């Protein structure tokens, strides 16, 4: 971990690689007047919108919608089974399980044609008091239980003892984006009205504590966090149904779930502050988390070490080293297909456009894990056997 100061703000950086966009955004963050204690940068750091992905930002009495990001509540879930991977026939894996999952779960920008039962939606929220969620609710009932696009994925994996695992990466779909964009606009208007020193072109407009706008965003953000969990839970339920039909004697352990795009009130260094985790995972002492690799590489079930210097956080994955556009333009399709085929991984890479999320576009997950050995310890090492990308 490297320590330095920028614009008077201490920075603690676990990342060994940092792109130019991220450096500028770090400088912008360090100029904010309400940063608390220091800025923490995880090893999967790379440029985002306003704040780099892989950043943990602590603030005094303000919340920044773009420091949470557009996919509010995005996160991971994983389930271990009692099935040895070597006992699954190839035809069962490809034709029953993978085909069944694709049939049950809409991918990319697709959604269900009919609204899902409201029992799958978040409970105990006053939706009537929410501007965006109320407007988007009917649409959201068709999005719950859908994967989404980008780096979202469903993987079947095996651990070092050969047991089958299911892993999902997904979030709050279009709902989270609508909430983020709306409240970022609200924050920008407020900041300009009151002559804030935080310029709108930084994409770091904020909502002050004890304002209606802060409370409104906070409630809608919490709904999106819960919606992200509901989304992953429903997908996991339907994947389990597909596997149960193909392998009737299968049993499933309880689901591990953790989010990596959200804000929360927490106590650090003797004070209550708002922690923004954007592409960062909570890693309190003993807390179980999930750090996925890129397509075709290892993923990890981890246990937090509660390191106070990272605000008890760790990375959320490997982190990009190449934009999606650059990956499509520069990577070799045949080479990337061969990498997966050589490992025997069932995949659906067929065209140049599918190269957006291949492993060559990401940092080496093994190096990322080595760089955060003081943040988490590895509980389970997982390797992919089949992958579905959004």
Locate each region found by the language model.
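Beta-strand elements of modular eukaryotic interaction domains
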Residues: 30
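Domain-length cofactor-binding catalytic modules of enzymes
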Residues: 2-25, 34-39, 47-53, 57, ...
């Amino acid at each position: 971990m490297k320590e330095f100061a920028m614009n008077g703000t201490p920075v603690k950086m676990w990342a060994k690689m940092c792109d130019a966009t991220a450096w500028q955004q770090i400088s912008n963050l360090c100029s904010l007047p309400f940063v608390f204690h220091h800025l923490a940068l995880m090893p999967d750091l790379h440029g985002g919108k306003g704040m780099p992905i892989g950043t943990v930002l602590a603030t005094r009495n303000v919340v920044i919608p773009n420091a949470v990001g557009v996919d509010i509540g995005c996160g991971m879930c994983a389930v271990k089974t009692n099935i040895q991977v070597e006992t699954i026939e190839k035809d069962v894996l490809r034709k029953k399980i993978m085909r069944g999952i694709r049939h049950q779960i809409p991918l990319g920008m697709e959604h269900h044609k009919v609204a899902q039962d409201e029992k799958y939606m978040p409970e105990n929220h006053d939706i009537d008091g929410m501007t965006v969620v109320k407007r988007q609710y009917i649409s959201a009932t068709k999005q719950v239980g859908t994967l989404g696009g980008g780096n979202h994925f469903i993987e079947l994996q095996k651990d070092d003892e050969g047991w089958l695992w299911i892993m999902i990466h997904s979030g709050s779909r279009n709902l989270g984006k609508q909430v983020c964009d709306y409240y970022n606009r609200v924050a920008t208007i407020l900041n300009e009205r009151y002559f804030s020193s935080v310029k709108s072109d930084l994409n770091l407009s904020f909502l002050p504590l004890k304002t209606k706008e802060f409370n409104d965003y906070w409630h809608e953000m919490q709904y999106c966090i819960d919606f992200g969990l509901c989304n992953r839970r429903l997908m996991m339920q339907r994947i389990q149904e597909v596997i149960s039909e193909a392998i009737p004697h299968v049993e499933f352990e309880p689901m591990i779930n953790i989010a990596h795009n959200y804000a929360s009130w927490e106590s650090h260094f003797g004070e209550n502050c708002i922690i923004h985790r954007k592409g960062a995972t909570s890693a309190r002492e003993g807390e179980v988390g999930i750090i996925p690799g890129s397509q075709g590489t290892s993923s990890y079930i981890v246990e937090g070490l509660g390191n106070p210097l990272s605000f008890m956080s760790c990375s959320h994955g490997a982190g990009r080293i190449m934009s999606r556009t650059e990956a499509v333009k520069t990577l070799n399709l045949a080479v990337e297909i061969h990498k997966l085929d050589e490992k025997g991984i069932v995949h659906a890479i067929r065209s140049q456009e599918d190269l957006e999320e291949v492993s060559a576009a990401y940092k080496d997950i093994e190096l990322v894990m080595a760089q955060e050995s003081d943040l988490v310890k590895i509980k389970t090492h997982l390797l992919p056997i089949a992958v579905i990308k959004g």
